[in-house]
């Protein structure tokens, strides 16, 4: 297998595995776990795996004092993005939620335009309008589909939080930190938030030995949409660069919709199909359009990736 083919395959695997989030999260809800318990264990299992990966790559664990506050801010943004995304699954079909979440590159482009005075092309403006039309269709998706205003607001909150996370990382000194190290500390901050919430509320759902199948879902939620997605993303960027990898991120919502329909009996109406196509095409055009694609170096919802700005190759693994 040549390098380019390998890169495209890995990018597709990365996006598809991230799209498995609902596949493993929804059974945990059905088994009695609340979203904070799900995220508590997901973060808790991911942190040591990242630490091992960091050690294998012979990276140090030290941080400077000036990095502490940015890491706390990023940890809060990341935790908020996770909370709102996983909350949305309680109020709408997971496939629709994952598709609306996919608009975060457009939100990043708007943030860069409004706050950093970066030019926004007519093509990007047209894509934004098309994406909004797609979202309107998804929110009025027809008989049988589960969509609520509360769910849509949660997804928008998740997309906005993650967009702010991306911009903060790329516009601050913290962006120079090794990717895995940064992610590990960000998740550590998030885990502290979830642990504090559990202590204050006195509520943390821990599956019993009889509920072994829930532990399998927790581990799968950690391994597939997180660790495998991270590894495949870093390798894909090395092989084909950041923009093609970002474009293949289109498989994230497609995978979520596929499992939603196949496993959870979510409804697929003509409006949903048209809405999906409009959102996916508009976002793909924005990502392929230059600087926004370069800015979205940290692609995965769980584990972003850093790329050398000059070469387009993965850096500081």
What are these regions (language model features)?
Residues 37-48, 78, 86-119, 124, ...:
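Specific alpha-helical transmembrane segments that line the substrate/conduction pathway
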Residues 31-32, 91, 117-119, 175-176, ...:
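Helix-loop interface residues and adjacent transmembrane-helix termini in multi-pass membrane transporters
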Residues 24, 46-64, 132-146, 189-214, ...:
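Membrane-interface helix-cap regions at the ends of transmembrane helices
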Residues 5-10, 36-52, 127-130, 150-157, ...:
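Hydrophobic alpha-helical transmembrane segments of multi-pass integral membrane proteins
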Residues 50, 72, 111, 120-140, ...:
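Hydrophobic transmembrane alpha-helices of multi-pass small-molecule transport proteins
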Residues 1-37, 41, 80, 84, ...:
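Glycine-/small-residue-enriched transmembrane alpha-helix faces in small-molecule transporters
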Residues 39, 43, 140-141, 214, ...:
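C-terminal-most transmembrane helix of multi-pass membrane proteins
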